[in-house]
Amino acid sequence: MVKNSFISVIFQEKKEENRGSAEFQIVSFTNKIRRLTSHLELHKKDYLSQRGLRKILGKRQRLLSYLSKTNKIRYKELIGELDIRESKNR
């Protein structure tokens, strides 16, 4: 799990009002993705978890593309802090 000051700031900025923001959702999806990835390293044939992982990856990718279109600076900060690769534009 990623625990650093940036993520704690996102979680604590506006506790209840902030849950709908794209940044909060991206951070929570990233935590779920990392948890599922470590689970799948142990259980390689858990196909339902693999499907869930692919769905969460797609949701996070859509949110990241939305954030890059609306706020490029915040997008760059977020992918830098979470160690996520920048997506290729198609």
UniProtKB/Swiss-Prot annotation:
Location(s), subcellular: Plastid, Chloroplast
GO cellular component: chloroplast; ribonucleoprotein complex; ribosome
Gene Ontology BP, a term: translation
One Pfam family here: Ribosomal_S15
Protein's organism: Gossypium hirsutum (Upland cotton)
GO molecular function: structural constituent of ribosome
UniProt entry keywords in alphabetical sequence: Chloroplast, Plastid, Ribonucleoprotein, Ribosomal protein
Alphabetical list of InterPro entries matching this protein: Ribosomal_uS15, Ribosomal_uS15_bac-type, uS15_NS1_RNA-bd_sf
Name of the molecule in the record: Small ribosomal subunit protein uS15c
PANTHER family (alphabetical): RIBOSOMAL PROTEIN S15, BACTERIAL AND ORGANELLAR, SMALL RIBOSOMAL SUBUNIT PROTEIN US15M
Record gene name: rps15
SMART domains with a match to the protein in the record: Ribosomal_S15
Assembly and oligomerization: Part of the 30S ribosomal subunit.
Family: Belongs to the universal ribosomal protein uS15 family.
Main subcellular location of this protein, as a coarse class: plastid
Coiled-coil region: none
Database matches in SUPFAM superfamilies: S15/NS1 RNA-binding domain
